[in-house]
Amino acid sequence: MKTLLLTGGSSGIGLTTVQLFAQKGWRVFELSRSGKTTAAITHIDCDVTDDTSMKHAVDQVMHLTDHLDVVISNAGFGISGPIEFTSVEEAKKQFDVNFFGAFRLAQSVLPIMRQQGYGRIIFTSSVAADLSIPYQSFYSASKSAINALALALANEVRSFGIRVSVLMPGDVATGFTDAREKNIEGANIYKGLHSAVETMEKDERSGMTTAFIARTFYRIATAKYPKPIYVGGMIYKVFCLLNRLLPKRLVNWIVG
């Protein structure tokens, strides 16, 4: 039986993804702070911002299985607000969950995959990694850092039979929107702050379904020759293509 380990599977994209893999007959391990064990999914408590918690969670998984086929780093959240009024602590928290959480997971599972001689690691990134969104700068930066990490890692571990990919979804309708930590300090100076965040949240609430993204994860997990980067959603593939073809000055003006 193939195995999946996924972080951040208690809700949203992660929950739909572990449910899909379980339906496909995989043994599924879901790591988060608030998930629940079901007949098909084994939940293990894990805080991706804590080294000890991550190592202990992966150790628990390996007490229950002798191999890992696919690992998906999906835990994440978002903050919004002007760069000028974002504290270093807020920025560090964003990176600690989104980037360093992914890094901790990769470090924890790589020795296992290296020893078994195969495995696949998939990182959840975002179209925001390619298109830096105003008032969502640190979220964009954390996802861009994940892309850079994944591309480098793919070359480092290819000889061990390990494949690494990134999935960059566009807007997806989940509880992620309501969970965003919004900093409205400076709204009297940055007049476009409220309207920019409102537009962003409206787009997210009317975005793609979690089922679509879960199916994309499954396609990446089972692909014979997985690509390094996938973009979720046709319109977002067009956006990312135009970002590469058009002058950066024009793209940045359009995004802004």
Q: Which residue ranges define each predicted feature?
A:
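The beta1-alpha1 cofactor-binding region of Rossmann-like NAD(H)/NADP(H)-dependent oxidoreductases
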Residues: 46-56, 88
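Substrate-binding pocket helix/loop in short-chain dehydrogenase/reductase
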Residues: 82-83, 90-92
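SDR active-site lid
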Residues: 159-227
